[in-house]
Amino acid sequence: MLKKKILLWIDYSFLHFGIANYFSKLNYDLFGIVDSEESINNFLQNQKIVSFSKLWYLYENLSPSQPDMAYLKIIEEKYQINLWSIIYTDRYFYNKFNPFYKFEYNEILSLIEQECKLFEKILSESEPDFILTNTITHHYQYLFYKICKSKGIPLLTLEPLRFANKWMITNGPMYDDLDISNFNKSKSVQLSNNDINKLSTSSGKIYLKNKLIKTEISKSKKFSAIFNFI
């Protein structure tokens, strides 16, 4: 029986490195995209905790060059995406929000081109059955999601509900392709103050749509996990 392949997006939080550690004990092939600084790259290259089939280091694959406009046009047609609509989602490309560096037109397109080439290479080599990532906060994560969505590859994000300690697993950004017209059809739920207090003080849980998939973790298991990690 062939192993299922999981591609994980690993950043400085190490959240998905921990998730990879869990899946490493099961029958899965693990791959990773590393979106972090050099010190963390060095750790991942030398650690013996999780065995990855392959890791790709995002920033090591990006360097200034003249953009290939023909290639970018092919990408837009191939995946049915508007690259500028993705670029506009990233605050770092705006002078107002990024006083440290002003990106030029060609620099932005060059970055997008190299990111597309890297993502196509990663997906071609890893052929993942599904992808696990954190909250999508940068243009390149959103670009990666759009490519995966076009290719029909499930991409699951772990999203904070911003209420107590609740989290939700979603199929991409929570509000992607949001149909505002449905708001008028949705039913509001009235909660009492007692209900709200219970929700805000209860232990963290993870939800998939309306189904609870993980209940609270006991204190003994938490301590056991700490000692196992150490």
Model-inferred region functions:
Residues 2-13, 34, 132:
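Nucleotide-activated donor-dependent transferases that construct or modify glycoconjugates
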Residues 15-18, 40, 139-142:
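Short, well-ordered alpha-helical microsegments
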Residues 18-19, 118:
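A conserved donor-nucleotide-binding helix/loop in the catalytic core
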Residues 22-116, 160-230:
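Conserved N-terminal ligand/cofactor-binding loop architecture of enzyme catalytic domains
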Residues 117-181:
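Conserved nucleotide-sugar donor-interacting segment of glycosyltransferase catalytic cores
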